[in-house]
Amino acid sequence: MSVVFESARPIADGVHWLGGCLSAFGHGEEVHYHVNAYLVIGRRRTALIDTGDPAHRDLVLAQLDEALAGRALDYLVPTHPEIPHAGNLPALLERYPDALVVGETRDYHLHFPEHAHRLRPRAAGESIDLGGRELVLLPAHIRDLENTTWAWDSGAGVLFVSDGFSFIHDVPGPDDEDEPVHRPGQCRLLSGEMPEPPSVAQAAYGTGRALYWTRFVDVSEAFGAIERVLDAHPTTLIGPAHGNVIDDVDGMLRTSLAAHRAVYAGGGLGQ
């Protein structure tokens, strides 16, 4: 797969969308899928949510240099220990020797024993003070690993949801791929900037493959919890790890719930 290079995109005051797209060929055409990371800049501290894919290591480092504009990176907040979410931790910790890994870090000492002294466990409900804004750690109500964490930025009202709220556009994924995909030219677009809003079928296609457990679980209770999260944490944007940043929060919530229900009913698997 080739890497599609894109510059970091500011999506809100103090929030930058980093990472890149991987490309593959499926069903006779090129398709891309996002592997996202997000930088939140406060008055005193900065935090990076997820690390991007190791294939994007040099890109993420360059994007950080640009977005930080000479400031240090203080906190790394991987949402869970999978390669697209934590794979660049060694490179980032080397580049930023004073940065700390903060969040649900219960098994990171096993993956990165040489960096165990830089782990700072924080539980859901705790906050990271960045100066003028806080990054609030939250339970992940849609997840593929038990120790997944979501986060909410109080400064701009951005909810970072890891593998939640992923969706595809226009085309099914590359053969044997599980990631939400889109066509070239649609990288780094907000969901509202896409030619068409995501459909239930597009959301269901990615959901049923990337989160296999959704085929067997009625998520109505989880979405009730998500609505309570949104009530308590006013949200203007949702930043998934895979897929476009969502600027129609209410619409995507309805679409995603319908997609999960379709997968559970066996009607959203693209088969």
Feature locations, PLM:
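Active-site neighborhood of phospho(di)ester-bond hydrolases with catalytic His/Asp-centered motifs
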Residues: 49-51, 73-81, 100-105, 159-163, ...
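Cap/insert and terminal regions of metallo-dependent hydrolase folds
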Residues: 168-271
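Short, surface-exposed connector motifs at secondary-structure boundaries
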Residues: 43-46, 69-74, 234-235
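Metallo-beta-lactamase
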Residues: 10, 96-148, 217, 221-224
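Helix-coil boundary/capping segments in enzymes
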Residues: 33-35, 61-69, 210-221
